[in-house]
């Protein structure tokens, strides 16, 4: 997984204050990575093969689960934490409103991909409208979600560093960890680092305390790798 240098995101990637946004950006890059895998799968994979179809379903289900967890953390923990600190700035509050609104637009697109997969499965062996439909809705999801991620990195994430100290941001991270639970957090880290190069993996793992790095290597990654995806 190679970190993408999107236009206008350097402030977010390196932080406008003391808040370390490494894991947030790594998660965004993992979503982009899986969108590429999803599009490639729809274009070329033999979904009539049961084993391949199962691995695609596993990858897609994990993507949806991670996106739901990520957006829920933002909508229920991160943005509400920022709002009182940014109450003096209508521009900043408008950005947070836009982030939440964009999340609402993405959810129906996930359902549309689910429906297109079902249609594709139902038309296997016949004509190709199911295949065409699947490619079309994946294109829409990819365009919408990557646009949202770029918008958030450009305008949303810098608000974290502007509003919170490093200690306050760590406290937000602990709250998200308690909400998600250790097992879900372990799956998240294994998912983020799936296919990561040595430098990116070291940057993300370096944010974990040593016992959790040991858990990643001994438990989370081996468990993650047992399931074929994509």
Label each residue range with its predicted role.
Residues 1-230:
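Small-residue-biased structural context
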């Amino acid at each position: 997984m190679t970190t993408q240098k999107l236009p206008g995101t350097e402030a977010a990637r390196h932080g406008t204050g003391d808040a370390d946004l490494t894991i947030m950006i790594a998660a965004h890059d993992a979503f982009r990575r899986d969108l590429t895998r999803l599009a490639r799968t729809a274009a070329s994979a033999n979904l009539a093969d049961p084993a391949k179809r199962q691995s695609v379903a596993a990858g897609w289900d994990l993507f949806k689960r991670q996106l739901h967890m990520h957006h829920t953390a933002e909508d229920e923990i991160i943005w509400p934490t920022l709002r009182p600190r940014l109450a003096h700035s209508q521009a900043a509050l408008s950005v947070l409103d836009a982030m939440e609104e964009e999340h609402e637009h993405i959810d129906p697109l996930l359902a549309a991909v689910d429906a297109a997969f079902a249609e594709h499965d139902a038309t296997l062996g016949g004509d190709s409208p199911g295949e065409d439909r699947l490619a079309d809705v994946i294109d829409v999801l990819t365009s919408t979600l990557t646009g949202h991620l770029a918008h958030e990195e450009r305008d949303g994430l810098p608000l974290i560093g502007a509003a919170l100290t490093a200690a306050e941001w760590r406290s937000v991270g602990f709250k998200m960890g308690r909400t998600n639970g250790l097992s879900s957090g372990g799956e998240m880290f294994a998912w983020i680092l799936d296919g990561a190069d040595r430098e990116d993996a070291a940057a993300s793992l370096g944010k974990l305390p040593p016992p959790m790095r040991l858990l990643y290597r001994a438990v989370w990654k081996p468990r993650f790798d047992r399931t074929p995806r994509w």
